Amino acid sequence: MSPLRIGTRGSALATTQTSHVAEALTARSGLAHELVVIRTEGDVTTGSLASLGGTGVFASALRAAVLDGVVDAAVHSLKDLPAAQPETLEIAAVPARADLRDALCARDGLTLATLPEGARVGTGSPRRVAQLKALRPDLELVDIRGNVQTRLARVPGLEQHDDHAPAAVGSPRGDLDAVILACAGLDRLGLDHVITERIDPEVMVPAPGQGALAMEIRAEDESFLGRALLDPEAPVGRLHAALELVDDRDTHVAVTAERALLRRLEAGCAAPIGAVARVGDGEAGAPRIEMTAMVAALDGSRVLRRTSSVQLDPVPADVVGDPAAADEWLEDTLFVAAEALGVHVAEQFVAEGADLLPGTVRGVDRGDGAPRPDDPA
């Protein structure tokens, strides 16, 4: 029986997080796997990400590998995926979310509140830039890119000596007071010790999908899936069954709401937009989905925030006695409610004039007219 081929980018972070997911998949399903490294344009370019012109720069090569049958599934950082999902592909599994917060990595243990006036802070994310300008307009923000080690090397005392993922040769060293990365990526790489502050989402709203991974496969036609159900040992049948075992429904529902917001605003993953949704207990034992979202002008001059929620109805009496039917009803209802919540919050932003803010929707103008993919770290 051939192993499942799992596609991944070649960076240390990508291979580490893909390995974690693939190992969990094997542990739960008993199916062997192999990692297939796919080089993406975002990995090999030496220029600014803006020069690549478009969102999804880290996903396109992986998606092509799935469609061409080079791999059975691809693992993405979900926040790097464009909000519009192609009809030829489906997100079949979203494992449990890691820490979704942004991480300040600063010299001398400094925090966002204790950084001195004029401190130089590096980030490649328009979302982080906009919120930092609103929170600390006295800071000097520096556009950066590169792998995690390259970014950390720009902060005195935080250079990581890793032969497998060294800092880029010739990149600046020690010229910044701090950088902002994602907690999830640092935790997955075992670099949590460089984090001087895990920034509260109420202070800095994370990117939609931050901390979550997506396992994407081909969206097969109904007749093909029907054959898979009839023959669970067929490759596609084994794949679907295995992915169901690593999918975390609450995380999948939450990111569905966050991505629905992006789609309704026609915004790319680079726009200065944040959103975080959670599934919790509501009334009468039924779930409740809550989402906090932020849309900002790129210069931080205006920041719009909204918190909204949707309460699900209890499971109907006609299915409550059938656990399988009740679970199917609940799952369908959760995803429909999540999609509606994301659209609702987006429409509230539009009513407040979010579509008039510079650099919020339909891509981000970085001065050369090219949209800028969000910070991959």
Curated annotation (Swiss-Prot):
Gene3D superfamilies: Periplasmic binding protein-like II, Porphobilinogen deaminase, C-terminal domain. Pathway: Porphyrin-containing compound metabolism; protoporphyrin-IX biosynthesis; coproporphyrinogen-III from 5-aminolevulinate: step 2/4. It catalyses: 4 porphobilinogen + H2O = hydroxymethylbilane + 4 NH4(+). Keywords: Porphyrin biosynthesis, Transferase. Its cofactor is dipyrromethane. GO terms for biological process: protoporphyrinogen IX biosynthetic process. Its EC number is 2.5.1.61. One of its GO terms (cellular component) is cytoplasm. The keyword Ribonucleoprotein does not apply. The modification S-(dipyrrolylmethanemethyl)cysteine is found at residue 269. InterPro entries: HemC, Porphobilin_deaminase_cofac_BS, Porphobilin_deaminase_N, Porphobilinogen_deaminase_C, Porphobilinogen_deaminase_C_sf. SUPFAM superfamilies: Periplasmic binding protein-like II, Porphobilinogen deaminase (hydroxymethylbilane synthase), C-terminal domain. Binds 1 dipyrromethane group covalently. Tetrapolymerization of the monopyrrole PBG into the hydroxymethylbilane pre-uroporphyrinogen in several discrete steps. Belongs to the HMBS family. The porphobilinogen subunits are added to the dipyrromethane group. This is Porphobilinogen deaminase.
